[in-house]
Design a protein with these regions (language model features):
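Bacterial Sec-exported substrate-binding components of ABC uptake systems
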Residues: 2-7, 14, 18-62, 178-213, ...
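Structured C-terminal subdomain patch of bacterial secreted/periplasmic proteins
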Residues: 29, 106, 158-174, 181, ...
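Structural recognition of the beta-strand scaffold that forms the well-ordered cores
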Residues: 53-55, 74-77, 125-129, 150-153, ...
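A short, structured surface patch at a secondary-structure boundary
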Residues: 54-55, 60-120, 125-132, 139
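Solvent-exposed loop/turn segments at secondary-structure junctions
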Residues: 58-61, 79-82, 125-126, 131-135, ...
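Extracytoplasmic ligand-binding site segments that recognize negatively charged/polar headgroups
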Residues: 81-87, 109, 132-138, 153-166, ...
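Pocket-lining segment of extracytoplasmic ligand-binding domains
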Residues: 244-251, 256-258, 264-289
Length: 385
């Protein structure tokens, strides 16, 4: 029963049901000159905002608004962006060099915004995520009294209703409602397709044992795994996989090596990005700007970890890498698609999520080259899907 309920929550419903399913706090119920943000706050505008501070989700902002929307941006959180989303930062600054000249207002890592700087820029609105809003409640109240609006978005929770609501808000604010609606419609359709197909499978074809790990710590140290409520763990839950970390008390934490080996995963997923940290030399790299050769070399190190040869996943060559950096966007429905193809290759053979995400960029952000590696199987056992 629980899995069925969660499956509905994650994978979405038909368009008619969605309007009833989204809670009021998460709906983008738009009226003329107003949006209802992700905390249920109605924010009214006398005119369309022309000066915008984007304190988070710049990629989503551009995906929905298009490249011209950058002309309205007066500041970004430049601190830490390059170090934790290197590929994204490189491609966006190449495509839109004016980003480099935008002032930084902080808040990328610690969520603390420089409200004095924001106030000096005279924006019409500040776009923040939920954590930033809560950390800066008093500071943002000062901005509100000065006439600067605050709108809260959320792509972090990985909830379809929040993804869609946030995207519709951006469409409303940027005069791109048609683009936003098309993006939300494709997102909902793609996830509902997964739901329908998996629901029709017999139980014996489900519940494959899976270990997922964030590969930012490198080969020598196990990185975070995820319980059933968050990020990759939530995706596995909704795809009816048996995530070995599903019952972990913390939303995310490293598992003990002995526990992983004893659990004998049938599939191993290593989530990669480009991180600038102490483990940079052998951390898993995936995503924008990453080449297949580089990703394969790094994935080979994870597949060759001591004692992991005892697992079914390594013995059968079911070791994969997925792109961690592209989660938390309106295009991230491709990652449930990728993993569905891994878990149920015959059922989802017709899907091509790699082409799907590239087409998304071509349609909505053609200035950005989406070349990179999004999902990859260890080279000794097969090619990418």
């Amino acid at each position: 029963m629980r899995r069925r309920q969660l499956l509905t929550t994650f994978l979405g419903l038909s368009g008619a049901a969605l309007s009833l399913w989204f809670p009021a706090a998460a709906r983008a119920e738009q009226t003329a000159g107003a949006v209802t943000d992700l905390l249920g706050r109605e924010v009214r505008f006398e005119k369309a905002p022309e000066r915008i501070v984007v304190a988070n989700y710049i990629l989503n902002f551009l995906m929905t608004g298009g490249g011209d929307a950058l002309k309205k941006v007066v500041a970004l959180p430049q601190d830490g962006w390059e170090a934790t989303r290197t590929g994204e930062y490189k491609l966006l600054t190449q495509a839109f060099p004016t980003i480099l000249s935008l002032p930084s207002i902080g808040g990328y890592h610690d969520n603390i915004l420089n409200t004095e700087r924001i106030l000096s820029l005279r924006p019409d609105v500040v776009l923040v995520n939920i954590a930033q809003y809560r950390e800066n409640a008093q500071r943002l109240a000062v901005l509100e009294r000065a006439g600067v609006k605050t709108v809260v978005l959320d792509y972090h929770a990985m909830k379809p209703e929040n993804h869609a609501a946030s995207t519709r808000i951006l469409g409303k604010l940027l005069g791109r409602e048609d683009a936003a609606e098309a993006q939300c419609r494709r997102y909902e359709e793609a996830l509902k397709d997964l739901q329908t197909r998996i629901a029709s499978l017999p139980e014996e074809k489900k519940h494959r044992r899976v270990y997922v790990e964030c590969g930012n710590e490198g080969v020598g140290r196990l990185g975070n795994s995820y319980n059933r409520t968050i990020l990759w763990g939530a995706i596995l839950e909704e795809l009816s996989a048996a995530n070995i970390a599903a019952d972990m008390k913390a939303p995310y934490a490293p598992l003990a090596r002995e526990f992983v080996i004893a659990s004998n995963p049938q599939t191993i997923l290593i989530a990669g990005s480009i991180w600038r940290n102490a483990a940079e030399a052998d951390s898993m790299r995936m995503g924008l700007t990453v080449t297949e050769d580089e990703a394969q070399k790094r994935l080979a190190g994870f597949a060759a970890r001591p004692l992991f040869e005892k697992t079914d996943a390594v013995r059968t060559g079911d070791v994969w890498a997925v792109d961690h950096g592209s989660l938390r966007t309106i295009a991230d429905y491709v990652f449930p698609q990728f993993i569905a193809k891994i878990l149920y290759p015959d059922v989802f053979a017709d899907l091509n999520p790699d082409e799907e995400i590239r087409t998304f960029y071509r349609n909505y952000l053609p200035e950005v080259n989406p070349d990179g590696v999004y999902c990859l199987r260890a080279a000794a056992t097969g090619a990418k899907r």
